[in-house]
C-alpha cells in the first residue's frame, strides 16, 4: 500500500496560492487568513495557544512583501488555510482525489485538529473540523472506496478517539497516537 501525507491545514509560502495572495489577488488572500492590522489577530491570540512558542512564537506573521499579517499556527512559512471559504475545501478535495487516482491507498491527513479557526476558541478540535473530515470520508467512499483516511491527531487520547467518528457518521478509518509511538520508541532505545 502507498501512503501519502496530505497537509490540509496550511500551504507553504512558496505555494502558487500564497504567491498570488502576496501579489494582491484578493481571491487568493481569502484562501488564507490575511489581515491589514493586528486587531483581529489579537482576538485570536487571546485564546489560541501557540504550538511552538520558543521556535515560532505567536500564531501570525507580518509579511513585509504585502504589508499584511497572515495566520501561521505552526511556522512563519506555513500559512493556514481558511476553510470558511468553500473554494479551499473544494480545491483541497480535488487535489486529494487527483492524488488518490494516481495510486494512493492511504491518505494521512496532517494536523487534523487545526483545520478550522474561530475567534474566541483554541482553534483546535472544533465541530467544523469533524464535519470537514466526515465530508472527506463520504467523498472518498463514493469516488474511491478503497482509500483509507489516517488522521494525525497529536493530542491526548480523549481528543484523538472522536476522530474515528461514529457508526452513523464515520470520519477517519485509522488514527495514531504520537505519544504512544514516542514512548514505545524511547523504550527501544533504553
Predicted features and spans:
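Short loop/turn motifs at secondary-structure junctions
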Residues: 103-105
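Conserved small/polar residues in nucleotide/adenosyl-binding loops
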Residues: 188-190
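Acidic/aromatic-lined carbohydrate-recognition and catalytic surfaces
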Residues: 1-93, 97, 101, 112-182
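Hydrophobic residues within beta-strands of alpha/beta enzymes
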Residues: 107-109
Amino acid at each position: 500500500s502507498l501512503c501519502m501525507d496530505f497537509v490540509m491545514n496550511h500551504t507553504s509560502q512558496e505555494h502558487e496560492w500564497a504567491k498570488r495572495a502576496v501579489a494582491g489577488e484578493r481571491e487568493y488572500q481569502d484562501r488564507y487568513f490575511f489581515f491589514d492590522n493586528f486587531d483581529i489577530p489579537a482576538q485570536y491570540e487571546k485564546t489560541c495557544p501557540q504550538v511552538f512558542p520558543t521556535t515560532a512564537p505567536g500564531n501570525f506573521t507580518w509579511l513585509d512583501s504585502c504589508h499584511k499579517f497572515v495566520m501561521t499556527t505552526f511556522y512563519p512559512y506555513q500559512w493556514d488555510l481558511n476553510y470558511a471559504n468553500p473554494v479551499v475545501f473544494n480545491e483541497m478535495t480535488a487535489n486529494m482525489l487527483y492524488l488518490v487516482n494516481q495510486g494512493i491507498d492511504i491518505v494521512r491527513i496532517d494536523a487534523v485538529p487545526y483545520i478550522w479557526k474561530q475567534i474566541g476558541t483554541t482553534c483546535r478540535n472544533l465541530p467544523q473540523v469533524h464535519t470537514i473530515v466526515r465530508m472527506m470520508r463520504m467523498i472518498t467512499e463514493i469516488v474511491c472506496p478503497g482509500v483509507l483516511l489516517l488522521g494525525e491527531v497529536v493530542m491526548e487520547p480523549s481528543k484523538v478517539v472522536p476522530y474515528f467518528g461514529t457508526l452513523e457518521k464515520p470520519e477517519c478509518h485509522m488514527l495514531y497516537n504520537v505519544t504512544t509511538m514516542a514512548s514505545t520508541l524511547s523504550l527501544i532505545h533504553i
